[in-house]
């Protein structure tokens, strides 16, 4: 057995070795390359298919194989690779060859010299076949790019050690694949030839010569195929002659760019060659070995060695080098007399300025650019890497530099030492490698002998060990100090920061601190005012000048002496004003990436400031300080030589491209081609305003005035409404190759990115509403009509309204679409705009001067004919009023006479103001009532647009509107007159009718008398004949009533059907058959009743004689009984029964159908579900309706709430009959239970305490309820059942954060999930022993507030606590499996027993939150939760889902307010609270104001605790997406207030109106020195101001940290306000007094403070104001008045006070009156791309908070040392040393800061002795490495009850370490190349720590 296993193991290892061997891999990759079938296979197929003899076939295959062999060899052999891989050679070879081949195939007998049969090898055609196959095989990868498979061999060659073996095996693999392919092809061809069915095809038989023709034209077919493939491939990479060549940047291009250009050329040409050569170590000489001459480091002082070396080499060597370089890069050396320059350069060595030569070279290069195309060499014509052939984006950088080349490789391969081994690095600096080569050439090889690899290894290992031991020592020392219980923050390693001022303890702002990295690193903003420049910038300048001085010593300059004097003045005396001014000027350039100054720019600046400073001095100063201007004054610029930044040069395009729009608007800078290259969206620049400043001076030329006019134009850009297929494509690039705008249909109207295809709405066929179909059927068939009536009527009503609105919207959309289509059609058809323009103008003239006057004349003549007074004056007045205003194509008004610019090309609209409407008469008494209507109409339609056919349209290209008819009022008048005539006529008729009626009445009365008498006679006859039946009749009556009662009873007793069937049925029949059905029912019923009564009376007499039927006993009874007894009667009874059955069959059928329906249908569609659905829908719709109408009253709210309750009750009543529990969703049960009040839960006690399987609640749900604390504590089990579900899911389930609505999930950003987990940690972060020491703590905090120096430490500690919490959470969630000791896996309520008791005893009976509120509302509002608004954006809103309110109001709110855990249960809550809430309920408004003046506000703070936020708006005005809130409208105000700016509102202000009496006196004291700088706090705040405002926003989270004492709260807000005032002052350089009014200042402050708000008008704004704005806009010729007004207010262009009638309205009053509405902008505005990126990649809060340790001295967070433990989460089970005050660090590494932490981890992993080579990855193989970690925590005290338990100590990876580090480790250190191993990496990065 052992022997077998041994054999098996050997076999497996052998197999593995074979599989991993180079030969097998080579065979595999070679075989794969067979599948990349390129056009080269066409020739092979041609030779096989065309039967031209075996010789040709053989020659074709041999040619094919040799070609492939050459390709494989070229991969390995560098010279061959260069020959075939050089694009120039292939281009030169391929194009003529293809052309020649094409002609040769077309003219068959072109090369027939007569075949010599002696030796077939000499036959030219056979040789050609061989050559064709050979050459085409070589082309395959270059001019005709094939698929990726062909390149696999090249790629794998890099990783392989024995390369020759790999190449040969690869070729063999390809050969095998090729043989298989050829054999298969041969089989297919033989099958085609032999297949009878193909030959016997009808079509082939009818065309006898078809096969022959095919065979003859086979060559032609193949040549066509070849041509198509060539065209296809050239389509993918276009031929260089056909594509458009972009113009280079202008002649005066900066030298930097030209250098870069050369760089790129050198890189592209040399890259392929260089890499292979270096790897193989081939000794071939480099054709141009020093690209460093033209590389980025160029001629820096550091590179003197290189230049020296070149000088030593002498003239010849340099000539060769330069010559080779220029030929390489494609510049014709014959046109460039380089040698002379070189001679002069070498002869003038003593001058020592090598830049001269470089400049001359550049000039020559630019000259070359100017040459005509035929003067340029062929290669550079055919192949130019600068062509923009692929559709890349052109991403503009800034005005100094060109766009970055994305497709250029930025890698440079070379060998270097890494981890003690020689490895290939792809980011090796090219200059270094070339420098190394030069040294190798100069120094003898013996001295450069490599050391042995072992030496290297050993050295590296030893250094690494040394470093890691040092680190370990330091780490252990820190831990030991911690263990000695002397905790201080010095143990923690913190980040060093730059300090601005030691005395004031100010740091340099984060943004500018070079020692900090992260999102704060940024460029310093440009500032132009001289006052801002402080000492530091002067210091920088001095330093800069010193460096330049050093530079001039190295490169002596003629201006040196002057320069030195100038420097002395700079050093000795303060800068003169001119220099100071100049600095501000330079500043702008200084902050751009280092580049050159432009002389023209300077002259521009000097022109502007000519009055103050002499421009000559300035330019001199530039000359000396920056050495930037040539002494000769030429425009060729030099590089700014300043402090060299460590940066990598990026390959850039040599073009500066501009878009069409830029060309049209003239926004581009100088030195840019005038023609556009980027195709932007179809647009037209419409000039709407030109200010012609006519110049009276006769001396000025026309050109100047033209320029002036150009600058004074105001233009809009009008985009076409068509889909934009251009998307910024560059001219000459291939549109079909774009990735993101794919065209996948034959005809595609809109362009879509494939990413968003799912968003496109599917066709209507596939989407239909099933429930919508079922509902009406159910309603029509069920007998429940009565119950649905209320709901149905409302639902129908809302549906009808919705449908109307939908239809209206749809109609509007359709019209709009049609309008746009028409406009686009006019725009696209050539010459359409010209035709339309002329037509419009002719129509306008016709209308104004021909049609309307003629109509007026006709009308008035008609009036005169009808003997009416003519109305000439009125009509002419109206006609004069009509104005025809010329507008742009967009509809922007110009004037009556002024035509828009280029109107024939761009289009024109003609707007008719006060369009003339012909009326039959003007003022009449008849129309006095309609006067108002007409006025309204007039106001509405006082303008229209003229259409091409002379009609009027509401909008440009709209459908023509209906004009009021001229004859309509005339006809109406006629109708009225006819009506009057009719009235008179009818009066006469009435008189006649009255007389006729009298006659009729007399005749009727006589008739009646006759009938009565006849009836009387008949009656008498009947009475005499029949006496007995009368008694029976009486019986019948009584019986009938009894029977109906019975029937009714039976119906009532039936619970399922509440109404008689007949009634239901009749209700649903159509109207036509209604009367018939009723009649039928009636007759049926009466007859059955008769029969039944007869039957019952007789039967019962017979069978049961003892029962009396009637109360009156008749003497005839016995006779009757006798009658029944006879047999004849029995037969009659049977007969009657049959008839009765027949009669009853109708009802039986009905009943049966109903039964069927009830059993089948109702079991499927159960009533409770539908009831609830209807209920929810109807309430939602009702609420929607209220929202839309904007009418809300308290009554209505109450009404809704009552409806809610009543409807719920109804649904409960109805549903209990058909209660099928399986159809009730868990969510529904949960929802209902959560809605019920606490008291009602006692009814469910039995259900909840029922321990077996419960019917109503699933066990999961039950447990969930317990977790949430919905039940009373009595109902909770002491021990929960252990879950047997996956524990992780379980853990998630217990945290409410994961129970989110769809809307919430959609809003989540990448970080939000993490934040939710973090919040859950905070939820448990309370120790409740301190509950009663609340007030005492508050006082302590308050006292300690005054001396802030002590609290920098506590501030740090506070930060550290946060870090601790996150660590704890991470630790807990990972250790979830260990259930007994983990804290989070237990319920918070179990641990916090105190909380339960205290909350039950201290809060009121109606506890609104139940147990839940105690925890979760505080989770949102307590200390330390809202840490940084930047991080926790999702904390901006309350999560109302976790609060289950009841529908009560006052008491519940009181309870709610009280149940805040941090608040003292003894705190007094004043009556104000209720007043405010009532106010909100009654009026539906927020009464909230901004602090007008902080001083006044202190006094009134008690009253307007809800007011200071400045929101004033109707509740329903705000669109709230989530309709959940409308189920509880009472709480919307709270939500809205909090939503505005939660990180500013203290948590108490939101819910509590605190008692302020105790603190009033202190506040008064504070008030007095509020604006004095003596107050330390304010000092601190002012210090904070020095950090930028955005930073302030980030850090303002600290404001919410107050414990509830109103004193600090208020002062803090005053400080904040103060800060904002000062901020705005410093920013604008203004004082407060400069504001014209309070309103303006307030608005300014508001917009500054609440950056997330935008202003919006209310629609009902003052009419006069709108008109003024319209006038204002008409002057500017703009469209939308309200938008412009708002923007102008925000920009301070328009004053608020001018617009308002009342003076000095405050902002709140403005909002109260509804003039201004302030809307919150959604938070997404805040997150720019960089921030979101940082969210995903960056360091987490743990990290960040620790690095801010020393950052803000004056941060106002105070922690009492005694309460230090309070904030650390240490439950009783997990408390370690309850009496100690230090932290037990969960993650000991946190002592070190991040970079050192990383180093420690990595070093401890480098167990270097096990590393045998690059391919071996021992980190994952060797578990022993992990044990190194046990030493860190060897002597720690036990954290748990059981000792020696393993802590799985893992960090969350993403927050703590940056992605780049991870990727680097992943890729190079641990030798994994994809992301799939990240998980392995995680495990090994965070190993276990053992505790002894």
From Swiss-Prot:
Keyword Repeat listed: no
CC annotations in GO: chloroplast inner membrane
The entry's keywords: Chloroplast, Membrane, Plastid, Plastid inner membrane, Protein transport, Transmembrane, Transmembrane helix, Transport
InterPro entries from the UniProt entry: TIC214 (IPR008896)
Annotated Acidic residues bias: 256-268
GO BP annotation list: protein transport
Ranges annotated as spanning the membrane: 18-38, 64-84, 87-107, 124-144, 172-192, 221-241
Biased composition (Basic and acidic residues): 1581-1602
Region (Disordered), start-end ranges: 250-300, 794-814, 1581-1609
Membrane topology: Multi-pass membrane protein
Subcellular locations according to the entry: Plastid, Chloroplast inner membrane
Pfam family for this entry, one: Ycf1
Assembly and binders: Part of the Tic complex.
Other observations noted: There is a partial copy of the N-terminus (positions 1-337) of ycf1 in the inverted repeat (BAE48059).
Function: Involved in protein precursor import into chloroplasts. May be part of an intermediate translocation complex acting as a protein-conducting channel at the inner envelope.
Similarity comment: family membership: Belongs to the TIC214 family.
The protein's name in its UniProt record: Protein TIC 214
């Amino acid at each position: 057995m052992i022997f077998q296993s041994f054999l098996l193991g050997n076999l497996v290892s052998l197999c593995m070795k074979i599989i991993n061997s180079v030969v097998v891999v080579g065979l595999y990759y070679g075989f794969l390359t067979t599948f990349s079938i390129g056009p080269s296979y066409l020739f092979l197929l041609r030779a096989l298919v065309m039967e031209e003899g075996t010789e040709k076939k053989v020659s074709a295959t041999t040619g094919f194989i040799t070609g492939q062999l050459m390709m494989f060899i070229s991969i390995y052999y560098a010279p061959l690779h260069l020959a075939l891989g050089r694009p120039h050679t292939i281009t030169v070879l391929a194009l003529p060859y293809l052309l020649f081949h094409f002609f040769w195939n077309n003219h068959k007998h072109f090369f027939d010299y007569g075949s010599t049969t002696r030796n077939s090898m000499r036959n030219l055609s056979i040789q050609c076949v061989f050559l064709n196959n050979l050459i085409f095989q070589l082309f395959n990868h270059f001019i005709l790019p094939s698929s990726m498979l062909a390149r696999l061999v090249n790629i794998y060659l890099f990783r392989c050690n024995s390369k020759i073996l790999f190449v040969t095996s690869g070729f063999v693999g390809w050969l095998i694949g090729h043989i298989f392919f050829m054999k298969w092809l041969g089989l297919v061809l033989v099958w085609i030839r032999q297949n009878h069915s193909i030959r016997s095809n009808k079509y082939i038989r009818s065309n006898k010569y078809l096969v022959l023709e095919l065979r003859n034209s086979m060559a032609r077919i193949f040549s066509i195929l070849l041509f198509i493939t060539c065209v296809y491939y050239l389509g993918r990479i276009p031929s260089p002659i056909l594509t458009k060549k972009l113009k280079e940047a202008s002649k005066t291009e900066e030298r930097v760019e030209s250098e870069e250009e050369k760089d790129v050329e050198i890189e592209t040409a040399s890259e392929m060659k260089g890499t292979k050569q270096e790897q193989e170590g081939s000794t071939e000489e480099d054709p141009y070995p020093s690209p460093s001459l033209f590389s980025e480091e160029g001629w820096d002082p550091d590179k003197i060695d290189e230049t020296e070396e070149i000088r030593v080499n002498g003239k010849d060597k340099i000539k060769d080098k330069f010559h080779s370089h220029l030929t390489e890069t494609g510049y014709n050396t014959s046109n460039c007399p380089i040698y002379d320059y070189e001679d002069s350069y070498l002869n003038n060595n003593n001058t020592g300025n090598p830049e001269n030569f470089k400049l001359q070279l550049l000039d020559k290069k630019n000259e070359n650019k100017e040459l005509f195309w035929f003067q340029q060499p062929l290669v550079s014509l055919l192949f130019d890497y600068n062509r923009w052939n692929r559709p890349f984006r052109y991403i503009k950088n800034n005005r100094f530099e060109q766009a970055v080349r994305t497709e250029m490789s930025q890698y440079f391969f070379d060998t270097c030492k890494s981890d003690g081994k020689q490895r290939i690095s792809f980011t090796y600096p090219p200059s270094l490698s070339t420098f190394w080569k030069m040294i190798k050439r100069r120094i003898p090889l013996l001295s450069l002998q490599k050391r042995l690899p072992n030496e290297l290894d050993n050295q590296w290992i030893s250094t690494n060990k040394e470093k890691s031991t040092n680190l370990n020592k330091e780490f252990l020392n820190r831990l030991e100090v911690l263990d000695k219980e002397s905790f201080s923050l010095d143990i923690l390693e913190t980040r060093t920061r730059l300090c601005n001022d030691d005395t004031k303890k100010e740091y340099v702002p984060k943004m500018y601190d070079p020692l900090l990295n992260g999102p704060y690193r940024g460029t310093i903003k440009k500032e132009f005012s001289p006052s801002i420049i402080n000492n530091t910038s002067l210091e920088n300048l001095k330093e800069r000048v010193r460096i330049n001085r050093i530079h001039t010593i190295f490169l002596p300059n003629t201006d040196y002496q002057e320069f030195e004097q100038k420097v002395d003045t700079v050093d000795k005396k303060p800068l003169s004003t001119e220099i100071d001014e100049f600095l501000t000027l330079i500043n702008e350039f200084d902050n751009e990436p280092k580049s050159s100054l432009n002389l023209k720019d300077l002259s521009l600046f000097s022109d502007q400031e000519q009055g103050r400073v002499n421009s000559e001095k300035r330019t001199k100063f530039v000359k000396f300080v920056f050495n930037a201007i040539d002494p000769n004054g030429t425009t060729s610029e030099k590089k700014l030589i300043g402090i060299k930044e460590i940066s990598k040069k990026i390959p850039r395009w040599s073009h500066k491209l501009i878009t069409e729009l830029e060309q049209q608007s003239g926004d581009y800078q100088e030195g840019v081609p005038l023609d556009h290259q980027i195709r932007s969206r179809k647009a037209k620049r419409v000039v709407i305003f030109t200010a012609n400043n006519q110049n009276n001076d006769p001396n000025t030329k026309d050109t100047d005035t033209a320029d002036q006019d150009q600058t004074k134009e105001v233009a809009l850009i009008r985009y076409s409404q068509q889909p934009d297929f251009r998307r910024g494509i560059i001219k000459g690039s291939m549109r079909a190759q774009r990735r993101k705008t794919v065209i996948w249909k034959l005809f595609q109207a809109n362009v879509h990115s494939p990413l968003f295809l799912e968003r496109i709405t599917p066709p209507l066929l596939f989407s239909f509403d099933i429930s919508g179909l079922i509902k009406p059927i159910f309603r029509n068939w069920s007998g429940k009509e009565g119950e649905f009536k209320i709901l149905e009527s409302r639902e129908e009503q809302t549906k009808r309204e919705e449908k109307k609105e939908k239809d209206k919207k749809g109609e509007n959309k359709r019209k709009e679409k049609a309008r746009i289509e028409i406009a686009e059609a006019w725009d696209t058809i050539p010459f359409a705009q010209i035709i339309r323009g002329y037509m419009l103008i002719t129509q306008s003239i016709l209308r104004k001067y021909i049609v309307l006057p003629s109509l007026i004349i006709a009308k008035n003549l008609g009036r005169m004919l009808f003997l009416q007074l003519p109305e000439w004056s009125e009509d002419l007045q109206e006609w004069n009023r009509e104005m025809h205003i010329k507008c742009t194509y967009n509809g922007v008004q110009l004037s009556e006479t002024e035509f828009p610019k280029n109107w024939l090309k761009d289009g024109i609209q003609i707007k008719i103001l006060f369009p003339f409407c012909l009326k039959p008469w003007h003022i009449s008494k008849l129309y006095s009532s309609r006067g108002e209507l007409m006025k309204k109409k007039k106001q509405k339609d006082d303008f229209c647009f003229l259409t091409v056919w002379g009609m009027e349209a509401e909008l440009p290209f709209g459908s023509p509107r209906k004009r009021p008819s001229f004859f309509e009022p005339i006809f109406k008048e006629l109708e009225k007159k006819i009506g009057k005539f009719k009235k008179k006529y009818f009066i006469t008729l009435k008189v006649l009718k009255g007389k006729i009626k009298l006659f009729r009445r007399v005749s009727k009365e006589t008739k009646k008398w006759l009938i009565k008498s006849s009836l009387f006679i008949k009656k008498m006859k009947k009475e005499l004949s029949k006496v007995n039946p009368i008694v029976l009749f009486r019986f019948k009556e009584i019986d009938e009533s009894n029977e109906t009662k019975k029937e009714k009873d039976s119906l009532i007793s039936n619970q399922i059907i509440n109404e008689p069937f007949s009634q239901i049925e009749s209700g649903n029949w159509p109207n036509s058959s209604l009367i018939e059905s009723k009649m039928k029912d009636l007759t049926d019923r009466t007859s059955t009743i008769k029969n039944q009564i007869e039957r019952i009376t007789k039967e019962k007499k017979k069978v049961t004689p003892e029962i009396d039927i009637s109360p009156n006993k008749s003497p005839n009874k016995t006779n009757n009984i006798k009658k029944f007894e006879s047999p004849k009667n029995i037969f009659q009874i049977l007969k009657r029964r049959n008839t009765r059955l027949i009669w009853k069959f109708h009802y039986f059928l009905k009943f049966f159908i109903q039964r069927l329906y009830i059993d089948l249908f109702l079991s499927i569609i159960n009533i409770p579900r539908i009831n609830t659905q209807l209920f929810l829908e109807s309430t939602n719709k009702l609420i929607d309706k209220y929202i839309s109408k904007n009418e809300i009253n308290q009554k209505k709210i109450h009404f809704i709430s009552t409806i809610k309750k009543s409807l719920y009750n109804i649904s409960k009543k109805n549903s209990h009959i058909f209660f099928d529990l399986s159809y009730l969703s868990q969510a529904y049960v949960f929802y209902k239970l959560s809605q019920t009040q606490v008291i009602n839960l006692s009814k469910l006690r039995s259900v909840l305490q029922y321990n077996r399987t419960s019917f109503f609640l699933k066990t999961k749900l039950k447990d969930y309820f317990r977790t949430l604390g919905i039940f009373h504590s009595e109902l909770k089990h002491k021990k929960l059942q252990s879950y047997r579900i996956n524990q992780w899911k379980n853990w998630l389930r217990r945290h409410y954060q994961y129970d989110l609505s769809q809307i919430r999930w959609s809003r989540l950003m990448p970080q939000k999930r993490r934040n939710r987990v973090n919040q859950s940690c905070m939820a448990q972060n309370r120790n409740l022993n301190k509950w009663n020491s609340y007030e005492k703590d508050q006082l302590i905090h308050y006292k300690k507030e005054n001396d802030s120096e002590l609290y920098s430490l506590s501030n740090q500690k506070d930060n550290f606590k946060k870090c601790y919490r996150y660590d704890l959470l991470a630790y807990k969630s990972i250790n979830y499996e260990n259930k007994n000791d983990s804290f989070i896996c237990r319920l918070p309520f179990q641990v916090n027993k105190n909380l339960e008791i205290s909350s039950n005893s201290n809060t009121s009976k109606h506890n609104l939150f139940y147990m839940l509120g105690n925890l979760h509302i505080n989770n949102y509002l307590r200390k330390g939760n809202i840490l940084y608004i930047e991080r926790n954006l999702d904390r901006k809103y309350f999560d109302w889902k976790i609060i289950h309110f009841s529908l009560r109001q006052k008491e519940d709110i009181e309870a709610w307010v009280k149940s805040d855990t941090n608040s003292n249960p003894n705190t007094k809550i004043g009556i104000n609270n209720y007043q405010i809430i009532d106010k909100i309920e009654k009026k539906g408004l927020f009464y909230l104001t901004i602090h007008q003046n902080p001083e006044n506000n202190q006094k009134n703070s008690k009253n307007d605790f809800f007011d200071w936020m400045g929101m004033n708006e109707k509740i329903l005005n705000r669109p709230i997406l989530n309709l959940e809130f409308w189920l509880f409208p009472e709480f919307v105000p709270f939500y809205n207030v909090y939503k505005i700016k939660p990180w500013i509102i203290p948590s108490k202000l939101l819910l509590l109106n605190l008692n302020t009496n105790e603190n009033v006196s202190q506040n008064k004291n504070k008030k007095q020195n509020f604006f004095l700088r003596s107050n330390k706090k304010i000092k601190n705040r002012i210090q904070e101001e020095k950090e930028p405002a955005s930073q302030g926003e980030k850090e303002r989270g600290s404001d919410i940290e107050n414990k509830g004492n109103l004193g600090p709260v208020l002062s803090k807000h005053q400080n904040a306000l103060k800060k904002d005032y000062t901020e705005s002052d410093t920013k604008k350089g203004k004082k407060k007094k400069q504001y014209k009014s309070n309103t303006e200042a307030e608005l300014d402050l508001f917009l500054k403070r609440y950056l997330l708000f935008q202003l919006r008008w209310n629609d009902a704004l003052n009419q006069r104001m709108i008109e003024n704005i319209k006038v204002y806009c008409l002057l500017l010729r703009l469209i939308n008045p309200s938008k412009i007004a708002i923007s102008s207010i925000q920009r301070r262009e328009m004053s608020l006070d001018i617009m308002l009638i009342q003076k000095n309205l405050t902002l709140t009053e403005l909002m109260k009156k509804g003039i201004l509405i302030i809307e919150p902008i959604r938070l997404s505005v805040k997150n720019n791309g960089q921030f979101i990126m940082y969210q995903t990649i960056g360091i987490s809060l743990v990290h960040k908070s620790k690095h801010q340790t020393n950052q803000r001295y004056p941060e106002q967070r105070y922690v009492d040392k005694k309460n230090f433990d309070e904030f650390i989460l240490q439950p009783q089970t997990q408390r370690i040393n309850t009496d100690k005050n230090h932290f037990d660090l969960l993650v000991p590494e946190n002592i070190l800061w991040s970079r050192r932490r990383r180093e420690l981890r990595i070093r401890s992993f480098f167990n270097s002795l096990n590393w045998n080579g690059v391919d071996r990855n021992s980190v994952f193989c060797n578990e022993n490495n992990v044990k190194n970690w046990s030493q860190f925590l060897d002597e720690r005290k036990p954290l748990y009850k059981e000792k020696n338990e393993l802590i799985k100590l893992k960090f969350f990876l993403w927050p703590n370490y940056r992605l780049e580090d991870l990727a680097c480790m992943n890729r190079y250190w641990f030798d994994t190349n994809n992301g799939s191993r990240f998980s392995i990496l995680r495990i090994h990065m965070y190993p276990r720590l053992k505790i002894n």
